[in-house]
Curated annotation (Swiss-Prot):
<dbReference type="GO" id="GO:0006298">
    <property type="term" value="P:mismatch repair"/>
</dbReference>
<dbReference type="InterPro" id="IPR012337">
    <property type="entry name" value="RNaseH-like_sf"/>
</dbReference>
<feature type="binding site">
    <location>
        <position position="18"/>
    </location>
    <ligand>
        <name>a divalent metal cation</name>
    </ligand>
</feature>
<protein>
    <recommendedName>
        <fullName>Ribonuclease HII</fullName>
        <ecNumber>3.1.26.4</ecNumber>
    </recommendedName>
</protein>
<keyword id="KW-0479">Metal-binding</keyword>
<feature type="binding site">
    <location>
        <position position="19"/>
    </location>
    <ligand>
        <name>a divalent metal cation</name>
    </ligand>
</feature>
<keyword id="KW-0464">Manganese</keyword>
<dbReference type="GO" id="GO:0005737">
    <property type="term" value="C:cytoplasm"/>
</dbReference>
<dbReference type="InterPro" id="IPR022898">
    <property type="entry name" value="RNase_HII"/>
</dbReference>
<dbReference type="GO" id="GO:0043137">
    <property type="term" value="P:DNA replication, removal of RNA primer"/>
</dbReference>
<dbReference type="InterPro" id="IPR036397">
    <property type="entry name" value="RNaseH_sf"/>
</dbReference>
<dbReference type="GO" id="GO:0030145">
    <property type="term" value="F:manganese ion binding"/>
</dbReference>
<dbReference type="InterPro" id="IPR001352">
    <property type="entry name" value="RNase_HII/HIII"/>
</dbReference>
<dbReference type="GO" id="GO:0032299">
    <property type="term" value="C:ribonuclease H2 complex"/>
</dbReference>
<keyword id="KW-0963">Cytoplasm</keyword>
<dbReference type="InterPro" id="IPR024567">
    <property type="entry name" value="RNase_HII/HIII_dom"/>
</dbReference>
<keyword id="KW-0540">Nuclease</keyword>
């Protein structure tokens, strides 16, 4: 379970940053930045973990608790499919992180970033591999980012109902691939990703 040790050891305002949506075939990448102005309560801390390890119900409970917590500063940023295609997925993740941090409302003393490759940020950075299972701030950011992106994909699924995005969040599941065969590529698909690119090229050769 994550804890507040990294934040407490540094002191000052420490923000956790994480992104969601690096691997899907459709939809934007979303990042969140979360900083606590005081150590989170035991009740809130008990809800926080790597968003991928949480059930949908517990993840929503954690999300709602974070959004209601007056001591939690939260910023959310995204990079669009067009931006992913223009600058590549890694740079789009960094762009989403910078946007999330810019919406935090202040400049932190330190950013704890999940992963091993550092983005350019306007503050000192500490990379934390597996950070969403180590730092409460990063875990909180992972939850905010995932719930935000999942909700966006549910909304997109209303207009594009053949791909199962409300269930698979744009990942390349069997249902998603079947939808691509039946309905083809939408403007929300990442054309630079191999499965989509290969499908477009195959259709061009068959024409």
């Amino acid at each position: 379970m994550p804890d507040y040790a990294l934040e407490a050891a540094h002191g000052g305002l420490v923000v956790g940053i994480d992104e969601v949506g690096r691997g899907p075939l459709a939809g934007p990448v979303v990042a969140s930045a979360v900083a606590f102005t005081a150590p989170p309560s035991e009740t809130l801390s008990s809800l926080l973990d790597d968003s991928k390890k949480l059930t949908a119900r517990r993840r929503m409970l954690a999300y709602e608790a974070l959004m209601a917590d007056e001591q939690a500063l939260i910023g959310i940023g995204a990079a669009s499919v067009a931006e992913i295609e223009r600058i590549n997925i890694a740079q789009a993740c960094y762009l989403a992180m910078r946007r999330a941090l810019s919406r935090l409302g202040c400049t932190p003393d330190l950013a704890l970033v999940d992963g091993k490759h550092a983005p350019k940020l306007p503050c000192p950075i500490k990379m934390v591999i597996g950070g969403d299972g180590i730092s409460l701030s990063i875990a909180a950011a992972s939850i905010i980012a995932k719930v935000t992106r999942d909700r966006l994909m549910v909304r997109l699924a209303v207009r594009h109902d053949a791909y199962g995005w409300e269930r698979n969040a744009g990942y390349g599941t069997a249902a998603h691939m079947q939808g691509l065969k039946l309905r083809g590529v939408t403007p929300h698909h990442r054309r630079g990703f191999a499965p989509i690119r290969n499908m477009i090229e195959a259709e061009a050769h068959a024409a």
